């Protein structure tokens, strides 16, 4: 697996995309249920049922995907188990 270092500006862009993903998760559950999504600049730029498929699509269309938030949008209900 390839490891990439992000400079400050690109890391901030990545953080903004992750923040947007978290803030909009409920909307994404309705619009992109059970899909992997790529977020850039406050919008979904691609989605796919498989992570491999999404990454292949992104690499075809973009030269640098390091700032994208790439996450899975699950509709499964999370339960907290306290022991």
Feature names for model-found ranges:
Residues 70-83:
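Short, mixed-charge low-complexity intrinsically disordered segments
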Residues 36, 66-68:
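Residue-level recognition of the N-termini of beta-strands and the immediately preceding loop/turn
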Residues 17, 24, 50-54:
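Amphipathic alpha-helical interface surfaces
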Residues 21-41:
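Short aromatic-glycine-(Arg/Gly/Cys) micro-motifs in beta-strand/loop hairpins
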Residues 42-49:
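A short, exposed loop/beta-hairpin motif centered on an aromatic-Gly-Thr core
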Residues 49-64:
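A short, charged, amphipathic alpha-helix used as a generic interaction element across diverse proteins
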Residues 1-18, 23:
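Short, compositionally biased leader-like segments
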């Amino acid at each position: 697996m390839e490891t990439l270092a992000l400079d400050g500006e690109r890391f901030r862009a990545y953080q903004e995309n992750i923040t947007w993903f978290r803030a909009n998760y409920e909307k994404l559950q309705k619009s992109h249920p059970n899909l992997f999504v790529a977020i850039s600049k406050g919008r979904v730029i691609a989605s796919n049922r498989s992570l491999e498929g999404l990454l292949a699509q992104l690499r075809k269309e973009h030269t640098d995907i390091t700032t994208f938030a790439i996450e899975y949008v699950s509709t499964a209900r999370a339960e907290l188990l306290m022991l």
